[in-house]
């Protein structure tokens, strides 16, 4: 053949990259919006290629760009990310008050969505997200990750095995399920909201207007943003709507 005559050897791509190698052309491309907390866990997934990250906090953005290396572009405005035609999937790891609107806008931009829990702050917002996904033919995955990791709330109980037992009928029917919060972490202590907070200057690195987004305009205080935002109805759906999903979702799955 011409190839043999030229002394050219064609090596299968899996040989160069190993048995689990996925060439860039076959990988899904993604962007992660919100990299100050849970978004760090969305940066590196097998079979995907990270193209962009976005955060309203410049410190979060710069530190994460150093971590992921070259080839990844940083943004302060998520709308610029959605305009990129080369992004297949948008990972949303912002506070919950942004989940609904960002998911809908991502679907409108032709992106599939992988969203951190809770899906949205309210049931009504969640219904709008479902409608948008159906209308635009996009996929939506909610990252209730204890189900996917098959480890009920990190306590070692395999969810899939428990589902098999329930499906077998060995436990009888109907079942009564009691959910308790024995996790070794006091959510209420760490994430309870505070009243009468004195307004403070907005840090230079934070685009506070972008962080607030669709939430009511309130004076800045560090306790209302980042890790402690969960204690405020403006940004989250309370303990049951947020961390409660980790308990409730696996139960819904195996029932």
Question: Residues of each region from the PLM?
Answer:
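N-terminal Rossmann-fold NAD(P) dinucleotide-binding loop
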Residues: 39-40, 99
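Beta-loop-alpha module in the N-terminal Rossmann-like domain of NAD(P)-dependent dehydrogenases
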Residues: 72-132
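A contiguous active-site-proximal alpha/beta segment in oxidoreductase catalytic domains
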Residues: 112, 120-210
């Amino acid at each position: 053949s011409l190839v043999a005559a030229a002394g050219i050897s064609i090596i299968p791509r899996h040989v160069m990259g190993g048995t689990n190698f996925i060439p860039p052309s076959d990988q899904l491309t993604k962007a992660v919006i919100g990299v100050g907390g849970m978004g760090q866990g969305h940066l590196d997934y097998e079979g995907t290629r990270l193209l962009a990250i976005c955060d309203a906090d410049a410190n979060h953005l710069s530190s994460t760009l150093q971590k992921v290396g070259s080839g990844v572009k940083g943004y302060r405005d998520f709308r610029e990310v959605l305009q990129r035609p080369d992004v297949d999937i948008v990972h949303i790891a912002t506070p919950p008050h942004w989940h609904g609107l960002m998911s809908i806008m991502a679907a409108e931009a032709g992106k599939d969505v992988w969203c951190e829990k809770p899906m949205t702050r309210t049931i009504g917002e969640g219904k709008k997200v479902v409608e948008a996904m159906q209308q635009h033919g996009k996929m939506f995955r909610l990252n209730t990750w204890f189900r996917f990791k098959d480890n009920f709330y990190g306590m070692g109980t395999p969810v899939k095995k428990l589902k098999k037992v329930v499906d077998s009928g060995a436990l009888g029917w109907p079942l009564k399920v009691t959910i308790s919060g024995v996790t070794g972490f006091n959510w209420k202590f760490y994430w309870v909201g505070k009243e009468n907070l004195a307004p403070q200057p907005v840090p230079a690195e934070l685009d506070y207007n972008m962080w607030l987004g669709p939430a009511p305009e309130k004076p800045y205080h560090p306790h209302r943003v980042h890790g402690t935002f969960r204690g405020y109805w403006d940004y989250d759906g309370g303990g049951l709507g947020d961390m409660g999903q980790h308990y409730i979702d696996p139960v819904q799955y195996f029932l």
